[in-house]
Amino acid sequence: MTNMKSVEAYQQLDNQNLKKVVGGKYYGNGVHCTKSGCSVNWGEAASAGIHRLANGGNGFW
């Protein structure tokens, strides 16, 4: 993670500019969706499933 910007390097968006941002939705369990469809990160999905089983059916998201 050495290629991340410092907090000071990011520009804060106001509400007007935030409305222009186009992005997808991340569900916290390895699934994320955009306009073109959904995809699964199977490693993360499996890990989320194991955590859910270990926590008695309570997810960590």
Swiss-Prot record:
<dbReference type="GO" id="GO:0042742">
    <property type="term" value="P:defense response to bacterium"/>
</dbReference>
<protein>
    <recommendedName>
        <fullName>Bacteriocin mesentericin Y105</fullName>
    </recommendedName>
</protein>
<dbReference type="GO" id="GO:0005576">
    <property type="term" value="C:extracellular region"/>
</dbReference>
<keyword id="KW-0929">Antimicrobial</keyword>
<keyword id="KW-0732">Signal</keyword>
<feature type="disulfide bond">
    <location>
        <begin position="33"/>
        <end position="38"/>
    </location>
</feature>
<keyword id="KW-1015">Disulfide bond</keyword>
<comment type="similarity">
    <text>Belongs to the bacteriocin class IIA/YGNGV family.</text>
</comment>
<comment type="function">
    <text>Bacteriocin active against Listeria monocytogenes.</text>
</comment>
<dbReference type="Pfam" id="PF01721">
    <property type="entry name" value="Bacteriocin_II"/>
</dbReference>
<dbReference type="InterPro" id="IPR002633">
    <property type="entry name" value="Bacteriocin_IIa"/>
</dbReference>
<keyword id="KW-0614">Plasmid</keyword>
<keyword id="KW-0078">Bacteriocin</keyword>
<dbReference type="GO" id="GO:0031640">
    <property type="term" value="P:killing of cells of another organism"/>
</dbReference>
<keyword id="KW-0044">Antibiotic</keyword>
<feature type="signal peptide">
    <location>
        <begin position="1"/>
        <end position="24"/>
    </location>
</feature>
<dbReference type="InterPro" id="IPR023388">
    <property type="entry name" value="Bacteriocin_IIa_dom_sf"/>
</dbReference>
<dbReference type="InterPro" id="IPR023384">
    <property type="entry name" value="Bacteriocin_IIa_CS"/>
</dbReference>
<keyword id="KW-0964">Secreted</keyword>
